[in-house]
């Protein structure tokens, strides 16, 4: 399996952190498996123009200090030559990659590909197809969806408990990973753990999540109805296309590796 090595999983976690910081998304949960990745995240809407200093800070988080310095010098050089229009256009090009789900996925894939190829020269395609997404509604559903993601290693037989796995949020946070801790902190700020559900209800819900394919809406009847009404011109049934729902709210994503890489050493 391509991701079987801890060094590759470490690169993937690094890429996820960099891409999230650059894109301005809130990651609440993740599980890096041997041949795919699950992420629960929120893409906050950007209501105001992102300040230039913030653009440079995020660019630095993704590309590193030297690249950010070169960008800043290029912007300053354009302005000194009286070409403020080009300078602003370049900043807007970078802003357009932020607070957007598809752009976040693209950024993440590119960053992981760069890190992976530094260790493992590989000319082929790493990822297979488009990512799959599910729009998640109320905190109750978000909490249970997170439980499903975190328990992936247990169902796969990789660990006896979620906390025992090093490459999901709870396990990485327990081992001191700062990014995983921030993910947990953000998640706890929007949902509160609850033990109100019986094991039977939890099991039924987890099976329901497992059966959901990309592009579905997961939430209460009212939430689903509201989303379908909001996109009534684009949605023909209760199964909403991924491209329709990816711009709003919470989403849970799983990315598959290309078939030929799933059994790679």
Question: What is the role of each PLM region?
Answer:
Residues 1-34, 42-265:
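Short Pro-Cys-Gly-centered "Cys-loop" motif that presents a nucleophilic cysteine in a tight turn
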């Amino acid at each position: 399996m391509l991701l079987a090595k801890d060094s590759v999983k470490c690169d993937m976690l690094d890429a996820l952190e960099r891409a999230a910081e650059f894109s301005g998304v809130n990651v609440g949960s993740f599980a890096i498996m041997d041949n795919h990745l699950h992420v629960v995240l929120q893409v906050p809407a950007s209501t105001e123009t992102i300040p230039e200093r913030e653009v440079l800070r995020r660019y630095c988080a993704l590309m590193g200090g030297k690249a950010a310095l070169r960008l800043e010098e290029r912007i300053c050089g354009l302005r000194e030559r009286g070409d403020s229009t080009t300078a602003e256009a370049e900043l807007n090009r970078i802003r357009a990659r932020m607070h957007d789900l598809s752009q976040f996925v693209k950024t993440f894939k590119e960053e992981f590909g760069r890190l992976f190829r530094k260790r493992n020269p590989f000319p082929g395609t790493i990822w297979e197809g488009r990512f799959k997404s599910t729009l998640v509604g109320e905190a109750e559903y978000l909490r249970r969806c997170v439980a499903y993601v975190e328990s992936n290693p247990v169902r796969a037989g990789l660990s006896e408990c979620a906390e025992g796995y090093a490459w999901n949020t709870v396990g990485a946070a327990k081992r001191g990973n700062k990014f995983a801790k921030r993910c947990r902190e953000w998640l706890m700020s929007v949902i509160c753990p609850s033990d109100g559900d019986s094991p039977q209800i939890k099991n039924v819900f987890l099976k329901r999540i497992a059966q959901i394919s990309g592009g579905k809406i997961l939430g209460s009847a009212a939430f689903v109805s509201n989303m379908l009404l909001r996109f009534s011109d684009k949605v023909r049934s209760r199964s909403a296309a991924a491209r329709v729902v990816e711009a709003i709210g919470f989403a849970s994503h799983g990315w598959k590796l290309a078939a030929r890489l799933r059994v790679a050493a």
